[in-house]
């Protein structure tokens, strides 16, 4: 079950490969995610020193968060992947045009996981084409319903 989805990712990028990564979170972040207080639309993934980090995601702290900590809603969060997967991703991202984007947060075995995708950015005409296809599918479904 998905906690947060990045709906714009499929519109802005051609998704080529998907990976499931663990997230290093603090306790207040897990509680906030359970309450649905997160956003990954502006998030992106970077590779630094053979480690993968999630930057730009916003997790709003709950109002009843502890007073002895100072929550940072947009802090950099480390992603956990196997070393072989990281090496493969480093090789792909170094190729021109590839990037890593977060797709969603979900639970697996009581832990919060992040689906990330190896993707290529879409050009403007690709986005328009995707929108035309979606509109045509919607219109086709409407015609089929009206016909029966």
Curated annotation (Swiss-Prot):
The keyword Cytoplasm applies. Residues 129-142 have a biased composition (Basic and acidic residues). The keyword Cytoplasm applies. GO terms for cellular component: cytosol. It holds the Pfam family SmpB. It comes from the Bacteria. Residues 129-148 are annotated as: Disordered. GO terms for molecular function: RNA binding. SUPFAM superfamilies: Small protein B (SmpB). It is found in: Cytoplasm. Keywords: Cytoplasm, RNA-binding. GO terms for biological process: trans-translation. PANTHER family: SSRA-BINDING PROTEIN, TMRNA-BINDING COMPONENT OF TRANS-TRANSLATION TAGGING COMPLEX. Belongs to the SmpB family. NCBIfam families: PRK05422.1, smpB. Required for rescue of stalled ribosomes mediated by trans-translation. Binds to transfer-messenger RNA (tmRNA), required for stable association of tmRNA with ribosomes. tmRNA and SmpB together mimic tRNA shape, replacing the anticodon stem-loop with SmpB. tmRNA is encoded by the ssrA gene; the 2 termini fold to resemble tRNA(Ala) and it encodes a 'tag peptide', a short internal open reading frame. During trans-translation Ala-aminoacylated tmRNA acts like a tRNA, entering the A-site of stalled ribosomes, displacing the stalled mRNA. This is SsrA-binding protein. The lineage of its organism: Bacteria, Pseudomonadati, Pseudomonadota, Betaproteobacteria, Burkholderiales.
